[in-house]
Regions:
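N-terminal acidic leader/helix
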Residues: 1-28
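Amphipathic alpha-helices that form helix-helix packing interfaces
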Residues: 7-10, 14-17, 34-37, 41, ...
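Secondary-structure edge/capping motif, primarily at the C-terminal ends of alpha-helices
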Residues: 18-25, 45-48, 70
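Short, charged, amphipathic alpha-helical segments
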Residues: 28-36, 54-57
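Short, charged early-sequence alpha-helical segments and their helix-coil boundaries
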Residues: 43-69
Length: 70
């Protein structure tokens, strides 16, 4: 698969996590859902190597930080 497409998929995946969980402070159930779904998404990207895995993890951490600051 083309690396540009994989990077696009990472960005889209993190965006979809944010869109699905809303833009307000998360409840405990929503937080658990976010973590569970992010773990599934990360497993999809691990196979594409360390750089792609790191990109996903860092973007996901930024999303977590966004929610923690709400």
């Amino acid at each position: 698969m083309d690396e540009k497409k994989i990077v696009y998929d990472v960005v889209l995946s993190v965006w979809n996590l944010a869109k699905e969980h809303g833009f307000e402070k998360l409840t405990d159930e929503q937080w658990d859902s976010l973590v569970e779904k992010a773990t599934i998404e990360r497993d999809k990207f691990k196979q594409h190597g360390e750089n792609i895995d790191l990109l996903f993890r860092q973007m996901y951490m930024a999303l977590q930080n966004y929610y923690e600051r709400k």
